[in-house]
């Protein structure tokens, strides 16, 4: 199979077994590619996790450690995923077989991409619905004047009402597929550019407002001033691992969502330079989210936390005590809605492109088939907080959403990242020479030759550590038998990945 033609054409299979060639749509602008890719990377973890773990782990000292891991972990994986996309000119459905060595089995990994995308969206669409629902509640004033217990109760009431959550989940699904059905340039690129521009404006305005609140300076100190005592109290090891894992998970690499945008990318710029821009934008959003949340918490004497309770209980209480709180609360949840929907749109585009590349279906046909399927697929996560609350799949207190998050965050993202890295460095995959040549095409910083050893041996080892530590942290408190069983399962998955990656027919 010829290599490199995929960046110009895609195969669209028709009923008689033949195919026609059609020019593949590209991004209309460099800015469009950067903002759409950053929209995929910018997720809820940037807001409900990063500011808290940053403050708890030593402030600016943690940020420096985090930036190091973004450079040595997130950057090369993102480069690998983008380059596979641009080099093949296809999504994950055809990318591996377009570039792999004859007789290898890399093309089987396409299923990791599509399965990961579906499982991620099975709960992410629900959470995007939460953001839209709270934006509406803040705008309508229905949260204004509530006491703290009532605000907490409002979130609990929402979780107990499958009808409410289903309606808003459906709104998120329809909005996102509505963007995707318009196409790459007229839909995904055009609308995501507007959303990301508004997101960046909102986040700056909200951050400035928080910084001028009374006593906000104490929050800034907690968040940004290096605190070596905090690092000593936690231990350097846990701090480093928190930085490493967040750097790994923040960029949404591993399930092909970045790969598909690489397939729409022109060759006038190097992959490394574009990856740096996206990482910087993602980091900017994460840091600015902290300047919104932490100073506001200190200004009103509220302990900053993490997770959904921070967004849906702590912050609404703060807005209720703030002058113009209804306006600021609405602006915040509109910002969060944009952050969530930009990710949903990006992953939906990956799903759509999978079927277009694999079967030659039209975009409209793929969207029509997936709208109903995605709504049905998202229902278990919705019901897991009410009708199916007694089903606790990964231990006491867990929910169906926790299971889906575990499958994606602790399995498909790290294993998918491993696949892309190995594919770009192993001879029976694409190979280092082909990968580096494609990545360095165009203007911008080039990937150096010395990176080969690091990406071939050290980076896979780091990914294995992140992967196994994720399993350990998830199951360490659930009993030795539980932990050992799941750790064995994790190792079996790793062996399967390496087995397929190293397979090659002797006569090939």
Each model region followed by its residue ranges:
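C-terminal membrane-solvent junction of multi-pass transporters and transport-like membrane proteins
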Residues: 108-116, 361-371, 407-467, 479-484, ...
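Membrane-interface "cap" regions at the ends of multi-pass membrane proteins
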Residues: 15-48, 77-82, 86-111, 266-270, ...
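Select transmembrane alpha-helical segments in multipass membrane proteins
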Residues: 26-37, 62-65, 105-118, 166-172, ...
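Inter-helical loop and helix-membrane interface segments of multi-pass membrane transporters/permeases
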Residues: 24, 53-57, 87, 92-112, ...
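Membrane-embedded translocation segments of transport machinery
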Residues: 22-27, 189, 193-341, 345, ...
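Transmembrane helix-boundary motif of multi-pass solute transporters/channels
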Residues: 31-69, 218, 256-262, 273-276, ...
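Single conserved hydrophobic/aromatic residue that forms the stacking wall/gate
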Residues: 1-12
